[in-house]
Amino acid sequence: MPASVFVSGATGFIAQHIIKLLLSKGYKVVGSVRSSEKGKHLVNTFGAKDAFTYEVVPSLEPEGAFDSALRKHPEVTVFLHTASPVNLAAEDVEKELLKPAVKGTKNVFRAIKHYGPQIKHVVVTSSVAAQFDYSRMQDPTHNVSEDSWNSITWADSKVNPFFGYMASKKFAEKAAWEFVEQEKPNFVLSLINPVYVLGPQAYDTEVKAELNFTAETVNKLLLLTPESELPEFDTPFVDVRDVARAHVAAFEEKFENQR
């Protein structure tokens, strides 16, 4: 019988594709949302009232943020942690990006330790941004491997929101690995580190005037007029549906303690 899976940040671009895939494979899914309104919207969107339920987690940062949600769902055996801030217009990088990402990850792992001993696999959505050296983005000799980390420090991250995002992914991921190393938990860990994630919204109802950051990059191109100047932009990219498949494959195929 398929497992029950908890997906944090269930309203997210990647998360919705993950949940759509999980439901199609017969899994029961519990998603965390920031408000009951968002949760009700997802129930209607997924159209699977018997298979999808939600728990309200208003903020990632408060200590014990995920405790209640996990206490209520002893049936969950897999946890997919996708929730993390992406705000490249952040004015206070530490407050809006770094602390929520790192504290949120720590809160998830502590909650699993205390209230989810039955959970056997945790998958965290990280990013290649945690790995590559930004100063060498155009360097064809720059190789990124499972052992790579970006060189951005906590202090460096405050220079601009992009550095802040890169640092948030790095330090949140390091917090996950450090927990596993120090606590020796019952679960195994997998990290998904995609490049720039593009693709359609999971459902037509999620198509809005302004989309999530990565999808909006393409949306803006489609809205250009013949007179518009084409923006310069180059990046490796991956289809969001493949990213969703990677999250599910990580626990189905037992890619244990790998990036």
Label each residue range with its predicted role.
Residues 2-32:
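N-terminal Rossmann NAD(P)H-binding glycine-rich loop of SDR-like oxidoreductase domains
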Residues 36-41, 47-103, 113:
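NAD(P)H-binding glycine-rich loop region in Rossmannoid oxidoreductase-like domains
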Residues 81, 91, 96, 100-162:
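Conserved Rossmann-fold NAD(P)-dependent oxidoreductase catalytic core, especially the SDR/UDP-sugar
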Residues 152-189:
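Active-site Tyr-X1-5-Lys
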Residues 162-164, 200-210, 229-241:
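Glycine-rich "substrate-gating" loop/helix at the edge of Rossmann-like oxidoreductase active sites
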Residues 183-186, 199-215, 249-259:
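Glycine/proline-rich active-site loop of Rossmann-fold NAD(P)-dependent oxidoreductases
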Residues 218-258:
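Alpha-helical substrate-binding/gating segment
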